[in-house]
């Protein structure tokens, strides 16, 4: 297709004076977006489509070269002199050839091809450009530092709105470097929220032979400034630039780039700080890698979206760092090993960090960025580098069980050796003693089949068994491992319990390869079973508490009957003298209280008024009740008021006793839930206070017998709850007989 003479006038006549297309015009446009100028018409072949400049004139004799291009204040007159086809026009004026379409930015370059020109220009990426900015706002700023070939504002293909960034092309790399040094983070365009970012576009620096020594730094404090970051890296060499990556709200993403003047200080800073230095306000050390430039993927051309072609969207800049920084900013332990960031393969890091390099400020819209945090950075230690499942997978990760995770670096030193399951869970024994203690508090007197630790070995496992009947079978197998692991020594199981478990057929001789498989699910189920165990123990304690309350109430009724009988017997046996006779055994009710309530203080049970009355109640041979006064020897059929008050006082006393008993039972139940069983035996061994001297000897004998019964709980031999119950019953019977 011929484009050279589409808009040209007659070749022989030349351009009209003052016309934009002639040699006298100052401004012109090229045939395409990337080139300008065009060859003249005439008898020769049509000019090259992408040629710059070209000979004007017509016919067989070509005139002077028509270079063209707009004037800018940076270049001197020598750059625009005529001749040679470089910015030359007829008569030495700044114009373009008389024929050929006009280029938008008009940079005549003689007869060079487009391929050569593509290798000469340098493309810069400009960030933080206002969405309302135009080319006239951007171009003058950059023309102060060199010859601007083109300014391309990036717009959305669907909406047509600007994306807040643009590309600027310079003719030489020196001009581009000059613009970067003068404008990067130093100039704010009108209407912008912050200074513009000026840096090389994708692959431009490498294409021109310049190498940038830039580090990608993660785990930065989001409140840190560029100055604070520079102070961290300054001791290792001259820091040329610090760039903090920010989101759409201008908030730091916790990562950025630090540029050094040479490779040696950059390497020294990375070796000294990566994995070792923790910034103030952060929980994990810095993660530092070289910010290698992005390399084109196979099948991806430089004109594609990643290199500023059609379909490019700067919004994907936000997608570049959101995923890695979201993973990096999450706390994963107080100390992270230095090698936790190493990728699975030595060459994977450059490709994964290329998206953050200096030469890739943005990526195509909707592009997927693969970061090392997804594959290798925080890869569970049970996986090897090649993604295969290693031998460490027998036990699930401790982070799923609510325990303190082991150091991540252990996975690198384990290799392929087989590790015992209990050694790989150092946090596991922290849960075992709690469950043992809680289980030891639950119902030690219900039957001989249950033992103190609720480790019910016979057939069906109780609620206190580990892992619901599966982990209990592993205890005999893993018993040598428990002895080897120092952290498991907190689990103190009586020898009778362990011996009885070893004696069970079918559970002792389990194959060794079954143990890891059976340990997987029970260990994960233990935290969820703890509340169920506590609820079951609480229900059992409540039932035992209710039964004890009923027994106490029956004892109180019997106590009242015995008091009345004793009082009546004393009244019948009294001598007939005139002196007042009082009850000779006021402390008898306290002496007959069973041993399980012997810790109630005497002061709380004694009423304010002495429980004495001269009237007693009797029954006549006919079956009628009458009342007799032992002092006046008076008998009445009606109940005397003095006797009515006496009965009320007795009722109040009984109510107070019942309340105190209930409170005491509740306290004991709470202590059983919170303290080990050894501490439970002490309340039962406390002696009764303020007992009459006549009964102290007998009470001491009862307490000694109780001590003998309860000390059997602490012996490592076989424990029979029926013996404990028999001891309590015998103590109660002796108390009644006294």
From Swiss-Prot:
It comes from the Eukaryota. GO terms for biological process: cell differentiation; flower development; positive regulation of mRNA splicing, via spliceosome; regulation of cell size; regulation of flower development; regulation of seed growth; regulation of timing of transition from vegetative to reproductive phase. The keyword Ion transport does not apply. Residues 52-70, 81-98, 301-311 have a biased composition (Gly residues). It holds the Pfam family RRM_1. Mostly expressed in young flowers (panicles) and stems, and also present in young seedlings leaves and roots. Residues 1-118, 292-414, 566-594, 670-738 are annotated as: Disordered. The keyword Repeat applies. Keywords: Developmental protein, Differentiation, Flowering, Nucleus, Repeat, RNA-binding. It is found in: Nucleus. Residues 122-203, 213-293 form the RRM domain. Residues 368-377, 683-706 have a biased composition (Low complexity). Residues 109-118 have a biased composition (Basic and acidic residues). Interacts with FY. Binds to SF1, FIK, RPRD1B, Os09g0509000/LOC_Os09g33480 and MADS8. This is Flowering time control protein FCA. It comes from Oryza sativa subsp. japonica (Rice).
